[in-house]
From Swiss-Prot:
Organism, scientific name: Psychrobacter cryohalolentis (strain ATCC BAA-1226 / DSM 17306 / VKM B-2378 / K5)
Lineage: Bacteria, Pseudomonadati, Pseudomonadota, Gammaproteobacteria, Moraxellales
Catalytic reactions of this protein: pyridoxamine 5'-phosphate + O2 + H2O = pyridoxal 5'-phosphate + H2O2 + NH4(+); pyridoxine 5'-phosphate + O2 = pyridoxal 5'-phosphate + H2O2
HAMAP family: PdxH
Keyword entries, A-Z: Flavoprotein, FMN, Oxidoreductase, Pyridoxine biosynthesis
Function: Catalyzes the oxidation of either pyridoxine 5'-phosphate (PNP) or pyridoxamine 5'-phosphate (PMP) into pyridoxal 5'-phosphate (PLP).
Family: Belongs to the pyridoxamine 5'-phosphate oxidase family.
Annotated protein name in UniProt: Pyridoxine/pyridoxamine 5'-phosphate oxidase
Cofactor binding note: Binds 1 FMN per subunit.
Pathway: Cofactor metabolism; pyridoxal 5'-phosphate salvage; pyridoxal 5'-phosphate from pyridoxamine 5'-phosphate: step 1/1; Cofactor metabolism; pyridoxal 5'-phosphate salvage; pyridoxal 5'-phosphate from pyridoxine 5'-phosphate: step 1/1
Residues reported in the UniProt entry to bind FMN: 62-67, 77-78, 84, 106, 142-143, 188, 198
GO molecular function, one term: pyridoxamine phosphate oxidase activity
Swiss-Prot/TrEMBL cofactor(s): FMN
Signal sequence extent: none
Length: 216
């Protein structure tokens, strides 16, 4: 069955973006927009689409959760042995995208990615809820085939016996954080009549950022 959505459209009229009034640092604007999304009760505003591409030149995308905005990029945590981890090992160029329909906004981040310090990953892992720590050990490897859900549940329950509530769960060597160092970041604000505002920050050789407006 085919479906036709060609007549479905909305008029975006909730905001505007002026190149003359934005801060020099894209991270300052990212923080401002993120805080506004939180205040407007956007559901999981820190959820972002992460696009990777390995040596096979086949792109893949999935949702991951932003956990930190640094002075040079953004940090998330995952399984290093996952499909995304394999892509990253072969090609460090990635893109991330936030889309907040409630605010009619997008943020597109392009950059290079690398593992963060293992001690920092371990510190974050130990802050996670106990069952989330245990669950991380079930995915060996993440995206690997499993016979059925019962096998997963049995592994999880056995791990909970091995590491009961209150016991320290070791940080897996295959699990940790990545930081995307931003080379370019685009802020998109929906406008009426498809005349959207698009401002892109580009990182220069000296580490500063220049800005320009893009056609919608």
């Amino acid at each position: 069955m085919s479906m036709d959505f060609s007549d479905q459209r909305l008029s975006y009229e909730k905001g505007q973006l002026d190149q003359q009034s934005i801060p020099a640092s894209p991270f300052e604007l990212l923080n401002v927009w993120m805080q506004q999304a939180i205040e407007e009760n956007v559901q999981e505003p820190y959820a972002m689409s992460l696009a990777t591409c390995g040596a096979d030149n086949k792109p893949s995308v999935r949702i991951v959760l932003l956990r930190e905005i640094t002075d040079k990029g953004i940090v998330f945590y995952t399984n290093y042995e996952s499909a995304k981890g394999q892509d990253i090992a072969e090609n460090p160029n990635v893109e991330a995208l936030f889309f907040w329909h409630k605010l009619e906004r997008q943020i597109r981040i392009s950059g290079s990615i690398a593992k963060i310090d293992a001690d920092k990953s371990a510190a974050y892992f130990q802050k996670r809820p106990h069952d989330s720590q245990v669950g991380a050990w079930v995915s060996q490897p993440q995206s690997g085939e499993v016979a059925n859900r019962d096998v997963m549940e049995q592994t999880f329950e056995q791990l909970k016996i091995d590491y009961p509530e209150g016991a320290a769960v070791p940080t897996p060597e295959f699990w940790g954080g990545y930081e995307i160092t931003v080379n370019e970041i685009e802020f998109w604000q929906g406008r009426a009549n498809r005349m959207h505002d698009r401002i892109v920050y580009h990182k220069e050789a000296d580490g500063s950022f220049s800005t320009k407006r893009l056609l919608p």
